[in-house]
A protein has these predicted regions:
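A domain-start/cap signature at the N-terminus of enzymes
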Residues: 1-68
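Gly/Ser-rich "nucleophile elbow"/oxyanion-hole loop immediately N-terminal to the catalytic nucleophile
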Residues: 60-65, 113-149, 160-164
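Loop/turn elements at helix/coil->beta-strand transitions in domains of secreted/extracellular proteins
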Residues: 65-69, 98-102, 138-142, 161-167, ...
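Active-site machinery of serine-nucleophile hydrolases
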Residues: 66-133
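Acidic beta-to-alpha connecting loop that harbors the catalytic carboxylate
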Residues: 76, 107-108, 194-197, 232-233
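Primarily recognizes the serine-hydrolase "nucleophile elbow" in alpha/beta-hydrolase
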Residues: 140-184
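C-terminal catalytic histidine-bearing segment of alpha/beta-hydrolase fold enzymes
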Residues: 197, 203-293
Length: 293
């Protein structure tokens, strides 16, 4: 039985529900393939009037027919378009995973908070789903990383979009108002120069190291993390931060974890893993801790 119409209008068994999920995905994927066929060649997506340009390189061979995806965020921010373009060019070649699609997007804006504006969330959702359909990306092996202002973005996006990531790597950034609660079910690594004193980045990295350590002590099944502070380095870590990639690669996303910690950032969401709320209930600062047996 491969017909959705047969399943409509009645309750479903567990097996039928799984089948319906597969059928709905097949139908959606076919539509997406048709509508987004030129995206990879164009190197650009537009969602709700906001454009995100990107460039990518493919490394290694697929694993069981699927590829990992590394989304790597450039630095800059709060400067000229030309300066941010230069940062983007640098980010395109900054890291080299052993396997997967290494994709460096160009932030749509040139503001200081270029990677944690509200439009970034829906752009990345669209980007990930496109690569799942068009480039055989494994949705459970999607990784986020970023340097400097890109690291600022990772601090923000890793917890608030944690249900999309397997792991995330923050390099040389500052969290601003971000909190780590949503990181419960992903791997999170933080790399910082011990002499990176601007905006107290080095001190804040140590605070997050302690914070993550306490979260894991209180919840030993969650908050897997690795923090590396290099005492000899300032803002530039001379490539030592690339050690984050093989550490991240050991993680796979669990779409249905038994325990979820959901913190609403200033950019709110109406769903997180298997939880959902109405738009009216998605309030900044709300925290939900939910478990299933």
């Amino acid at each position: 039985m491969r017909d959705l119409d047969v399943l409509r209008g009645r309750g479903l068994t567990r097996e039928e529900a799984l089948l319906a999920t597969d059928l709905l995905w097949e139908e959606l994927a076919q539509t997406m393939k048709s509508e987004r066929a030129s995206v990879l060649e164009d190197g650009s997506i537009v969602v709700e009037g906001v454009e995100l340009k990107f460039a990518f390189t493919v490394f290694g061979e697929p694993v069981e027919g699927k590829r990992s995806l590394y989304i790597s965020l450039h630095g800059g921010g709060g400067t000229t378009p030309e300066a941010n373009d230069k940062q983007w060019e640098n980010q395109k070649k900054l890291y080299k995973p052993t396997e997967g699609i290494y994709l460096a997007p160009r932030a749509p804006s040139n503001d200081w908070d270029l990677w944690h504006k509200p439009h970034i969330d829906f752009l990345f959702d669209y980007l990930i789903s496109t690569l799942v359909v068009l480039a055989d990306v494994d949705p459970n092996r999607v990784y986020l990383l970023g340097y400097s202002a890109g690291g600022d973005g990772v601090y923000q996006l890793a917890p608030r979009m944690a249900d999309r990531w397997a792991a995330a790597g923050m390099m040389a950034g500052h969290p601003n108002d971000a909190k780590p609660y949503g990181l419960r079910n992903i791997g999170f690594t933080l790399h910082m120069g011990g002499q990176d004193t601007a905006y107290r980045r080095n001190e804040v990295a140590k605070e997050w190291q302690d914070w993550l350590g306490q979260l894991q002590a209180d919840d030993p099944e969650g908050y897997k993390h690795w923090v590396e502070i290099y005492p000899q380095h300032g803002h530039w870590m001379e490539g030592e931060d690339a050690s984050a990639l093989p550490w991240m690669a050991q993680f796979k996303r669990n779409p249905y974890p038994k325990r979820v910690v959901w913190w609403q950032d200033d950019v709110t969401h109406t769903r997180f893993y298997w939880l959902a709320v109405t738009a009216a209930e998605a309030v900044e600062g709300a925290k939900v801790v939910a478990s299933v047996q």
